């Protein structure tokens, strides 16, 4: 019995030691959202390798398939699209040189529901809609896979008006890749 008590005491001391050495809080201004305000946190490295060139045009199709465990939180794939915009603009690439299309399907499908239908399904307002609106203002096309809408038994008119209803993610991704877009799975 004493061995068990000694082991448990040692384990508790070790756990306390680990939690005492937890990472410090980030200082103010450590993370920024220079273009898509409030979304897609970045910590810019001005001398980082593989920095985008301001004069180039960047064409990316984001394949958003991940869902979210918390329906009241922004979909992490959509937040990564915002992060990508923020990184390119922070590197000096003008928004007009970014040709970004983000297509949602699979577990990401619900992110494009209008607020009424998202509330009906999840009991909370759709937290993705403000970000979708900001991305659209920045020139990003948010698309929804029509086949995924059908698979989820959603109606097509339940999709938010800021979202483009695509025939499918399969055809969207391959069509855009044929047009020179780089695929970024999220």
Please annotate each region the language model reported.
Residues 17-20:
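N-terminal signal peptide c-region/cleavage motif recognized by signal peptidases
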Residues 53-71, 112-116:
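Acidic/histidine-rich, surface-exposed loop or edge segments in extracytoplasmic proteins
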Residues 9, 13, 23-28, 32-37, ...:
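A cross-taxonomic marker for long C-terminal extensions/tails that follow the last structured domain
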Residues 67-77, 125, 166:
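Solvent-exposed, acidic/flexible segments
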Residues 74-93:
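Histidine-anchored nucleotide/phosphate-binding helix
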Residues 59-63, 100-104, 141-144:
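Structural recognition of the beta-strand scaffold that forms the well-ordered cores
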């Amino acid at each position: 019995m004493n061995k068990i008590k000694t082991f448990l005491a040692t384990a508790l001391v070790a756990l306390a030691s680990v939690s005492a050495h937890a990472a410090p809080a980030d200082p103010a201004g450590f993370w920024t959202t220079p273009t898509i305000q409030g979304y897609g946190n970045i910590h810019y490295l001005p001398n980082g390798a593989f920095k985008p060139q301001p004069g180039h045009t960047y064409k990316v199709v984001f394949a958003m398939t991940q869902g979210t465990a918390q329906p009241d939180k922004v979909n992490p794939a959509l937040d990564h699209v915002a992060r990508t915009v923020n990184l390119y603009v922070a590197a000096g690439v003008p928004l007009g040189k970014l040709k970004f299309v983000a297509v949602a399907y699979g577990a990401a499908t619900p992110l494009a529901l209008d607020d009424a239908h998202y509330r009906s399904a999840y009991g909370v307002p759709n937290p993705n809609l403000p970000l979708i609106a900001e991305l659209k203002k920045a020139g990003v096309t948010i698309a929804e896979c029509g086949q995924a809408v059908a698979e989820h038994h959603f109606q097509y008119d339940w999709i938010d008006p800021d979202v483009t209803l695509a025939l499918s993610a399969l055809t969207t991704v391959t069509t855009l890749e044929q047009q020179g877009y780089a695929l970024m799975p999220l």
